Amino acid sequence: MKKKRDIADVLTDIRIARNRLRIMKTKIEGRLTQQESLSRSAVLTKEYIKEAEQLKKISEFLDTLDIILELIEIKVETIIYIGYIVNDAPAVLEALRELKKNGEFLSPELSALVDDIYNGFYSAINVPSEIKISASKEAKKVLDEAKTIAKYRESGKNIDINT
């Protein structure tokens, strides 16, 4: 029963991280709206446009991170409900690690949460080394899929997540 509690803690961390992402995203969207309105009327238009572009990049990164966390959340829920590991769950975790490595927009708070999720998953679940090795190779595909899903969601189109 100890493993179920540990994996439940990972699920809680995932949900906390997703809520914090939503809060950050809302703040960024508000700031972006403000920058866009200022860039229409101010003398410092170039600076406002540059900041707006940076805010859009941060927003896209947060969207991708949210998609990966959503995928992990689904995988962890499945593990809790059926009692054994889903084969592609480690690939999604490795994608989270890759995103963190490349994520210049990750705040220290979110970085710590991502580390807790990653380490908590592997401490709660005994993953065979051959699955972990293949997961590292598949992580790039998962990351690309998450970016594609984030773009679709941003455009207002719905896309099903392949779990």
Positions of the model-derived regions?
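Long C-terminal interaction segments enriched in charged/acidic composition
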Residues: M1-T33, E51, I67-T163
